[in-house]
């Protein structure tokens, strides 16, 4: 189940908010300009499903998001138990960074955690199957797919280069709980 845990950016051991209530998650994220919504997954895909098959299954939703955000490129990121070099893939996203465009993801399967540092707080957002998150351009954040990563997500881009990070050089990400914390004990 999706989860939002909010910390002061100077207190990674003391949550200010910890909830699994969808309405509360969406409202709290909306307050910082982050879109969070839930779509119904229409089908489970085999690990070898083509990008075309997955995008065809969500064609209406993909078109709506592209039209609303002006996204020109859409692809699928898929990490399975058979993906080689998972530690390096995970490490690529773990340092705080920004993007010059929105970072939009719809989770088809599996889970990942976005950490959004906004207004002196870190919002740790566990996204799971059926979750759409849109992180606005220039928002400082990082992402953890976990040590045993398994996920598939539709990604939306304004540019053809795809995912282009601008690393902040901050070490803040290493101070906050990792993926296993987010998927651990249920929120209070």
Where are the language model's segments positioned?
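Double-stranded beta-helix
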Residues: 146-188
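Short, solvent-exposed loop/turn segments at secondary-structure junctions
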Residues: 86, 114-116, 123
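Conserved metal-binding segment of the jelly-roll/cupin
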Residues: 127-147
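N-terminal leader/capping segments at the start of a protein or of a new domain
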Residues: 1-71
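Structural signal for conserved beta-strand scaffold positions within catalytic alpha/beta enzyme cores
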Residues: 6, 38, 75-78, 155
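Short, conserved beta-strand element in jelly-roll/cupin
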Residues: 98-118
